Amino acid sequence: METVNHFRCIDYVIDHATDKLTETHIKHLHQLLKTNTSDSQKEWFAVGDYKKLANEVGGEGTTDPKEVHKEMKQLLAEYNLLKQVNLDDVLNFYVQFERIHPFQDGNGRIGRLLMFWQCLQNNIVPFIITEDLRLYYNRGIQNWDRINGFLTDTCLTAQDYYKEHLQYFSIKF
């Protein structure tokens, strides 16, 4: 079900890529992703809303559920103040989003959908993290504050793969 829902999310991103990124859009993506899944049957799981219970990523704590709305509001305010958005801005938003980890589950998928949205919105060639790049990608996220080049270089490589596909299908970028 989540695979079908993920395609619905991609359609939503494409349809709304020129819209300003808002909490409403982000929550709607989560609702699209998690509707009619086993998670949606759990009374403690908030489909389309922020987490109710604390969670962690790779053993690291994330934002307390009571603070998520405030943190997301601040993240979006800072992002939406940018006059011109580049790849590093998109990646920084993603890393901060992952650290907040606003939803009980699905944060990585929602975060990657948001990067796709931001790339489309800002005329940045999108990218897909393939299995062969996953370790470098995860290392880049973990080391973002010290050496953001790890993640940037990994995503630039992924962009090169994406460009090859665009060229193959004669799609201008």
Regions found by a protein language model. Name each.
Residues M1-D105, R109-F173:
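FIC/Doc superfamily catalytic core
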